[in-house]
Amino acid sequence: MKQYLEALEYILENGKDRDDRTGVGTRGVFGYQMRFDLRKEFPAVTTKKLAWKSVVSELLWFLEGSSDERRLAEIHYGKPREELVGKNTIWTANADKQAKDLGYVNTDTIKDLGPVYGHQWRTWDAALGFVDQIAEVLENMHYDPNSRRHIVSAWNADRVNVMALPPCHTMFQFHIQDGELSCQLYQRSADMFLGVPFNIASYSLLTHMFAQLLDLKVGDFVWTGGDCHIYQNHFEQVKQQIIRTPVAGPTLEMPAFKDLDELVKTTPNDYKLIGYNPMDSIKAPMAV
């Protein structure tokens, strides 16, 4: 993850300061790219601790197609929602603020976020029903591996204004070459300290999952960012992180699954990072 530390340092030194939606203020650059070789190791940040269980929980929640924050809590904690009152997830703040302001149901057991990622991935609204983009991209990669159309988008312009949070990681594309599956993500808005290590791990895991479904090996994960920023109240944490020296990354251990239905029935505890030895966590507030 040396390239990630280099990105932080570059933005801190060369970025421009500007106001933002949250009122916190950022320093950022427009346009940045990083490439990770998934053949060698899993790109989990080692210069601070990655919230791995949260990464897996959210991805399984997306793949299930849910937009209920309390369903994410069930996946993460492995308990029914009735037992999880007061137990938060990484989406609770958005549910209790933006989604509530939009008029969505917000109770102890249901917290609707509107048509966010999972909805767009699995039930994109179409003229004659809906499109299951995940099922379609898997089918298309199986039958037409050389296609340049292996794309999933979460950016639905007609629905953005009714989402609790418009998608930050907006679209991703797969590429198959020589029996290897690679993935490129475009992230329109990139919280470089808190969000990006999480997103890198999430889409790298997705690439491993889909490679297993398609009986392929993994290739590269390419991360491309649009507005790449560091929040002003993260400056000291970033300075602390970039002086740390990264160590070797882990390898990924996944459960067996042969189709999408079996995949979405797996649990966060089924996915393990072997040989993951991160340094201490660096706490920072999330801008909402």
PLM feature spans:
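Terminal, non-catalytic protein-protein interaction segments that mediate quaternary/complex assembly
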Residues: 1-288
